[in-house]
């Protein structure tokens, strides 16, 4: 993980750690003119590592975004941000996106009253995301909410920390996307 962060820059969904501000000797030796291919490859890798996608999953999202109306890049980021694992991360119910994926895979999360165990589930506006009624599920979410720094919540999400409940208001606005993509 840390090699990826040093190479690509901060990836908030992968880990809360940040790259060192000092310039490493390796990076000084490798610095120079970056080709268009390298820039595109690094941006693609940022998306893959931040959202925890395989190459095939990312290609499917690019294909869907290409067919949709509007800017392909913006539509792609909206599709990725509306995934269930990412919404749990944005709500503060998990410290990282891989942690949110684990919560979903272990069946701790309900969407509109039904268990969803697919991290790539595409949330829609007016979806209600809650935890299972089991004590173990609530304790897990409670620990994440208590330990996470209360960052500003995106305006397309609402959270009720006492009931461990989140609501998707609308499709995300492009200014709230946390990852800077070139």
UniProtKB/Swiss-Prot annotation:
Task: Provide one Gene Ontology biological process annotation.
Answer: translation
Instruction: Give the chief site where it resides.
Output: plastid
**Would the keyword rRNA-binding turn up in this protein's UniProt record?**
yes
Source taxon at top rank? Eukaryota
GO terms (molecular function) for this protein are: rRNA binding; structural constituent of ribosome
Tell me where the signal peptide lies. Answer: none
Give the UniProt subcellular location, in the record's own words: Plastid, Chloroplast
Q: Which GO terms describe its cellular component?
A: chloroplast; small ribosomal subunit
What's this chain's function?
Answer: One of the primary rRNA binding proteins, it binds directly to 16S rRNA where it nucleates assembly of the body of the 30S subunit. With S5 and S12 plays an important role in translational accuracy.
Protein name per its UniProtKB record: Small ribosomal subunit protein uS4c
Which lineage?
Eukaryota, Viridiplantae, Streptophyta, Embryophyta, Tracheophyta
Q: Which gene encodes it?
A: rps4
